[in-house]
């Protein structure tokens, strides 16, 4: 979230400052996205971010919200509202016709995909965005846009009012160089700015692309987590610890797989090092010793000259019980903190009725209450904007 006055937002000289603020937010979201897709720069990747995001997104966003139009017929209630707010309701309205219009707009916008993509972005990066616009055929379109490009802009009022949306992305200019494109959308304008290779911190208005628009509200859907957190962000350190245990065990297994053979009570026929024929001052590994070692390694039976001799592999022992208990504790802490059920545990697989399953998902329902309220508020604002546009 960025806060400023609308007058500040539309001044060309302020664009670099706004982009700088936005990039700090977007870089953090990029880090979260990289964790989700498994780019952690480690040899072993435990995709708990992927698991938790998909479970919560499917639970909350698997079914798009339903909209119903209510036509008020209670004359007493109509009179009270009309007198109190000086606003007529229920006049010249047809609920069925209006419902058909809403359903038609939802159908051609693929409302279920739009909603799910928003939800997934929200839980993955802590924010989600969409744009609303009218086509040349006078169709109202709302579409999802990546949270890796956008930041909502609010004023200083209480409650906060959304006054714009800033979107930034990279594209090639006419000379083949990367430049930053900036789009700022308000309820009455779309401004486009871009920088150049020679002046990366100076953004110039593109008058040809910029245009005036007419909307009651900013035609942008924006839900940002009030704590700026993705669903898995509070447990990143625990996930890293869990991953470290698995990586440590993997390294030990690899070490044991490549273990050295220790032989006592026997002396090989050939020395390990001999003088380099080409450079007498240096020693080299004796090739005959290598051959001798290979013969003994491949041999099924080996005899030592000394009765006290023995043969054994130099390996590291793993305390498997302690390792598994530590992993189990970490997994329980991770899933408990983010309120995501473990669908592989015995309690979940043995839940043979809907009541038992509901108990498993009860913590998750509590965790998404805030998101539910935020989405409902923003969806109602989006439809208020669309209805006002139609009227």
Predicted regions and their residues:
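N-terminal start-of-domain structural block
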Residues: 1-39, 200-234, 242
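Generic detection of long, well-ordered alpha-helical segments
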Residues: 12, 95, 105-113, 120, ...
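Generic structural signal for hydrophobic core residues of well-folded globular domains
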Residues: 59, 72, 84-88, 92, ...
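A general structural signal for short secondary-structure junctions and capping/turn motifs
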Residues: 119-124, 155-157, 173-174, 250-254, ...
